[in-house]
Amino acid sequence: MAGSTLRFSLLLAAAFAGRATALWPWPQYIQTSELRYTIFPQSFQFQYHLSSAAQVGCSVLDEAFQRYRDLLFGSVAFRFPHPIEKRHTSEKNSLVVLVVTPGCDQFPSLGSVENYTLTINDEQSLLLSETVWGALRGLETFSQLIWRSPEGTFYVNKTDIEDFPRFPHRGLLLDTSRHYLPLASILDTLDVMAYNKFNVFHWHLVDDSSFPYESFTFPELTKKGSYNPATHIYTAQDVKEVIEYARLRGIRVLAEFDTPGHTLSWGPGVPGLLTPCYSGSHPSGTFGPVNPALNNTYEFMSTFFLEISTVFPDFYLHLGGDEVDFTCWKSNPDIQAFMKKKGFGDDFKKLESFYIQTLLDIVSAYGKGYVVWQEVFDNKVKVRPDTIIQVWREEIPVKYVKELALVTRAGFRALLSAPWYLNHITYGPDWKEIYLVEPLAFEGSPEQKALVIGGEACMWGEYVDSTNLVPRLWPRAGAVAERLWSNKMVSNLDFAFKRLAHFRCELLRRGVQAQPLSVGYCDMEFEQT
């Protein structure tokens, strides 16, 4: 979108204060006016255009229509059978949705088109999109345009919007290993992700602390690796529910099973998988990363990731590869002998690379792509050209802007997470620092910058569980959402604060216990139900 068009849209926003300019994230182009139309909840409908490729029976939109009707009006239509203000001709009793391309039963993907246009004027109320995924984004925007007068009447202003995401991958990571998050917490998070136009749920399922994923191929992993196999696990049905719940909101589920490090919870369920650590010439009784010297290790990984590849439908799996501590490998005589046999000398990065390359070959054979943490790139592991590198370190070994330059110069696609670790909290409006991050602020060619496909906000679970997850996430994660959706030029903090504060109040109205941005109040304060 041209800079002049964007400036025009911002000038309009300043000229017409009100609900129509309180959108989050901000669209690529918006033109609005003070002309408003009345909406009567008891008669309002979402309708399919006669020419739409999606019609009644489209699960994604049928459910979205009901969901947004409930969000907008709840039981208002039944409590107020007649509006307080007098009925007149300037009313809107429907939003007509026209989807160009069929695809109601598919899963969203990295290449999904999310563009939409929204036109509300005297002649029509029309949401036009190429796909159902774009229609979902447009429905969220429409829901934020509707406002209610003090007398109780609903309105929507005359508006034209053309919108599309700046980046195709806009993710949120949840860590369900260090603290187990109940299924309801995950589903609630997916709801709020959709309100913010996030489209990737990065599910960091397992880690050193616990293994809550219920494996049907290796049930002992869960029985012996979870905090409590009766209560603190995600069953096969739970996982299916998360995947489908996310799909209906246009959200991909990117499952992460991090190896060879971060795997202590795997050990009890798979004897021999982890490396025995030594103290001198004797085992110390402790264990380190996955043992890369045994054929049994790769036989296990082959079978396990065959299961994972069938359970999770997304093309990509996240294979981790970060923070591998070599201390245990160095102490183990069998590992030392294997290194000598392979000609690795004392370079344990070569051993790590051997393991990861073998694992990547296994996963590739199942027709999957993969995302890895930046250490895989830093340690010069040979990976496929279509590998996605997730940059998470802020300053070590280099600052993240330099890392992005290095990754893209090598021709790899990149995701940025380094400045967006939301589990790191400070007193005051830390959302501003989050908001002002510019993902492409590194030295590189246009071709390099095109390889940055987006980023993720991360909520690691050392000090986060279901008691504090929601207020720690929201509305702070929204700052990341807008940075990944909106035009680069949308960066004014005053403009952002007014809209984000309004959006936070809207989240409260929707039942989300989002924390305040500063001093102030909302017309509808949060009430625990």
Swiss-Prot record:
Query: Where do the record's glycosylation annotations fall on this chain?
Result: 115, 157, 295
Name the keywords, alphabetized.
Disulfide bond, Glycoprotein, Glycosidase, Hydrolase, Lipid metabolism, Lysosome, Signal, Zymogen
One GO CC term on file: cytosol
Q: Which residues form the active site?
A: 323 (proton donor)
**Where is the secretion signal located?**
1-22
Q: Which cysteines are joined by disulfide bonds?
A: 58-104, 277-328, 505-522
Q: Name one GO biological process term.
A: cell morphogenesis involved in neuron differentiation
Membrane-spanning parts: none
Pfam families, per this entry? Answer: Glyco_hydro_20 (PF00728), Glycohydro_20b2 (PF14845)
Q: Which Gene3D superfamilies match?
A: Chitobiase/beta-hexosaminidase domain 2-like, Glycosidases
Excised during maturation, the propeptide residues are 23-88
How is the enzymatic or functional activity of this protein modulated?
Addition of GM2A stimulates the hydrolysis of sulfated glycosphingolipid SM2 and the ganglioside GM2.
Report which reactions are catalysed by this protein: Hydrolysis of terminal non-reducing N-acetyl-D-hexosamine residues in N-acetyl-beta-D-hexosaminides; N-acetyl-beta-D-galactosaminyl-(1->4)-beta-D-3-sulfogalactosyl-(1->4)-beta-D-glucosyl-(1<->1')-ceramide + H2O = a beta-D-3-sulfogalactosyl-(1->4)-beta-D-glucosyl-(1<->1')-ceramide + N-acetyl-beta-D-galactosamine; a ganglioside GM2 (d18:1(4E)) + H2O = a ganglioside GM3 (d18:1(4E)) + N-acetyl-beta-D-galactosamine; a ganglioside GM2 + H2O = a ganglioside GM3 + N-acetyl-beta-D-galactosamine
User: Which GO-annotated molecular functions does the record name?
Assistant: acetylglucosaminyltransferase activity; beta-N-acetylhexosaminidase activity; protein heterodimerization activity
- Segments carrying the region annotation (Critical for hydrolysis GM2 gangliosides) are 423-424
Record-linked InterPro entries = Beta_hexosaminidase_sua/sub (IPR025705), Glyco_hydro_20_cat (IPR015883), Glycoside_hydrolase_SF (IPR017853), Hex-like_dom2 (IPR029018), HEX_eukaryotic_N (IPR029019)
Write out the similarity annotation: Belongs to the glycosyl hydrolase 20 family.
Q: Which PANTHER family match?
A: BETA-HEXOSAMINIDASE, BETA-HEXOSAMINIDASE SUBUNIT ALPHA
Partners and quaternary state? There are 3 beta-hexosaminidase isozymes: isozyme A (hexosaminidase A) is a heterodimer composed of one subunit alpha and one subunit beta (chain A and B); isozyme B (hexosaminidase B) is a homodimer of two beta subunits (two chains A and B); isozyme S (hexosaminidase S) is a homodimer of two alpha subunits. The composition of the dimer (isozyme A versus isozyme S) has a significant effect on the substrate specificity of the alpha subunit active site.
Q: What is this protein called?
A: Beta-hexosaminidase subunit alpha
Q: Which organism is it from?
A: Bos taurus
* Taxonomy of the source species: Eukaryota, Metazoa, Chordata, Craniata, Vertebrata
